[in-house]
């Protein structure tokens, strides 16, 4: 009986907040709920996926490519006809927690409800209350552009059976409070594993390789485990937290590709305590325990790569790959260089990179280097100065990345 009364009171309180918020009037005590909801929406990076280039925030329409076709993100502004204006808090919670939309249909996991299911009801309600206050935008979005048969929603039943289990996060009493807060953010709202874990042929995360890195939108999302070479093992928790705030690890590396958007729209807005909690949790992730080859196979193009590096890169990054502190990042020991996939280094050489937090911008070399020359430089950098990555950049890979999206 007590539980029922509490639920009724909570529902009434939320209804009061959302009703007044939708009318532009806030009752006493509503502001903290809305501020918390805005903060949590930032933590979940909702705006990045639900905003098309040049479009209104949260109005949807962003193209999300998958191996099975593409989706367009839906409008989640409070517009009554094309957004979620007619959704109740229960409708919203069912979508976030169970992956079922207002019409009772299984949702596609381009919406990461397999991670958001861990978020508490109170936090989901706060996000809902906040979204009720954003500007309603009339924007009809035809979300489903998947190939047959994946375009048929009933096919999601098999995927859900294999890869989805609903359940709110439960703290581990044996772990410190910071670790538990970090786990809640990383495994829930932050949905870090969604991009940083490889997926199988059906689009399910390979749990045995969780957080070990994966290709996303043509970029390689780096290994987040405590691996000393390719992951975060050599980083302090403070360095990880600082990276989430600024997008730069001083004198080591900078964010690339989609991660730059994550920092810009999400992690830089988090509190120092939350960023540090996420860092503490990531530091505890075990590395890949499988045996690794101790010796990198010889690269027959190494001589060409060394010459090209000297002519095009050595002036800034120095002969020993150490860079210049605060001006040019080092390449020796750089986690981007050491990543399992060479794609990020290829893109940086080919397209350059904008100025970030003190580092001078890097020019693009794609206009003057052939695909073979870019591959030679990348392989040289990945196997020099103690770097022990595999020299697996090829001209064909460079060509594919040149033809792909930015």
Regions found by a protein language model. Give the residues of each.
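Bacterial N-terminal signal peptides that target proteins for export
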Residues: 2-16
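C-terminal segment of classical bacterial N-terminal signal peptides
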Residues: 17-28
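Boundary of Sec targeting at the N-terminus
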Residues: 29-31, 38
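Flexible coil segments in periplasmic/lumen-exposed cytochrome c-class electron-transfer proteins
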Residues: 31-32, 43, 51-70, 102-183, ...
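Acidic/histidine-rich, surface-exposed loop or edge segments in extracytoplasmic proteins
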Residues: 70-78, 219-225
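Aromatic- and charge-enriched surface segment that lines or borders ligand/interaction sites
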Residues: 84-100, 104, 126, 233-236
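C-terminal structural cap/anchor segments
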Residues: 304-343, 347, 355-358
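Active-site/pore-lining binding-face segments in mid-to-C-terminal subdomains
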Residues: 345-372
